Curated annotation (Swiss-Prot):
Gene3D superfamilies: Ribosomal protein L14. The lineage of its organism: Bacteria, Bacillati, Bacillota, Bacilli, Bacillales. GO terms for biological process: translation. Keywords: Ribonucleoprotein, Ribosomal protein, RNA-binding, rRNA-binding. Belongs to the universal ribosomal protein uL14 family. GO terms for cellular component: cytosolic large ribosomal subunit. One of its GO terms (molecular function) is large ribosomal subunit rRNA binding. This is Large ribosomal subunit protein uL14. The keyword Zinc does not apply. Binds to 23S rRNA. Forms part of two intersubunit bridges in the 70S ribosome. It comes from Bacillus mycoides (strain KBAB4). HAMAP family: Ribosomal_uL14. NCBIfam families: rplN_bact (TIGR01067).
Length: 122
């Protein structure tokens, strides 16, 4: 459950290390983002020489949440951290690698490039 001012780790090699959520996209009064939702965020920490710099405003898709997600069969999937992948306007990732596992729910949200780059899909 990601809301405004939530901090997330970045799960790709775009150069950002930490994001701060500015807005949850999709609806006028939407408060929370879950796995597969798009957020607008600012880069709070970045590595030198990366594609994105500290202070950049970017779009990102949530790939891991501590609160988790409920599956249609009744099971839940939860992770140890909140993480996101920085994306372009056409929903393709800015980086070329994805770190850590991602949830299967991204496949339903048409983020197939992220799913194919991920080392593990849970």
């Amino acid at each position: 459950m990601i809301q405004q001012e939530s901090r997330l780790k970045v799960a790709d090699n775009s150069g950002a290390r930490e994001l701060l959520t500015i807005k949850v996209l999709g609806g006028s009064g939407r408060k929370y983002a879950y796995i597969g939702d798009i957020i607008v965020a600012t880069v709070k920490q970045a590595t030198p020489g990366g594609v994105v710099k500290k202070g950049d405003v970017v779009k990102a898709v949530v790939v891991r949440t501590k609160s988790g997600a409920r599956r249609p069969d009744g099971s839940y999937i939860k992770f140890d951290e909140n993480a996101a992948v920085i994306i372009k306007d056409d929903k393709s990732p800015r980086g070329t690698r994805i770190f850590g596992p991602v949830a299967r729910e991204l496949r339903d949200s048409n983020f197939m490039k992220i799913v194919s780059l991920a080392p593990e899909v849970l």
